[in-house]
Amino acid sequence: MSLQLEKNLILELIPHFYSLGWMKFGSGNFCLKNNGYAICVKDRVQRDFITENDIVTFNLSNQSVTKDLVNWAYIFSWVLSNMDAVACIYSTSVAAVGASMYNEKFTTQSKEMIKGIPKGNPSAGYLCCFDTLEVPIIHNGDSKTILDELKKVIELYPQTCAVLIRGHGVIGWGATWEKSKTQMECYEYLFELDYKLKTL
């Protein structure tokens, strides 16, 4: 996909993610990989009114200039470079924050949308709806702390495609932009369902 097409995709999808409650108050992001570069939007920009001027492109191997515009530049770069990912989504939804309040991991089983989550490697297929899904949880902090915690927890959960950040939200990734989107839809559905079942 060309750089311009990816920019157009960001301009279309981020307002959509905003409408779902994933990216309120200028937070959250959708980051795409294009060869050795990453593309996302600036921090603290209204996600429902983004323009092409709000889009940032940075080198995956050198994010120092970009960090002032995108605080999570190092995190996005690491995920896109190390997790066989083409796209990642950072959501600060109410459901994700609620799911992040468990001790060490969010766990759910025997739910239909579990089958939308892959078994780690894209070639390994998908989970069954009767499987148990585990999403690890790390502590919140500055971007360096989150990245350090992310690296550690992925060593413990190498098959995961998402990590919750306590009191903050979730980051998820996929082998294509379509998979990152549909996987996050499944995660968000499961997070919200868990919350609603617990409040019955």
From Swiss-Prot:
Database matches in Gene3D superfamilies: Class II aldolase/adducin N-terminal domain (3.40.225.10)
Top-level taxon in the UniProt lineage: Eukaryota
Annotated GO MF terms: methylthioribulose 1-phosphate dehydratase activity
BP-aspect Gene Ontology terms: L-methionine salvage from methylthioadenosine
Cellular component GO terms held in the UniProt record: cytoplasm
Disulfide bonds: none
SUPFAM superfamilies linked: AraD/HMP-PK domain-like
Family according to the record: Belongs to the aldolase class II family. MtnB subfamily.
Protein name, per record: Methylthioribulose-1-phosphate dehydratase-like protein
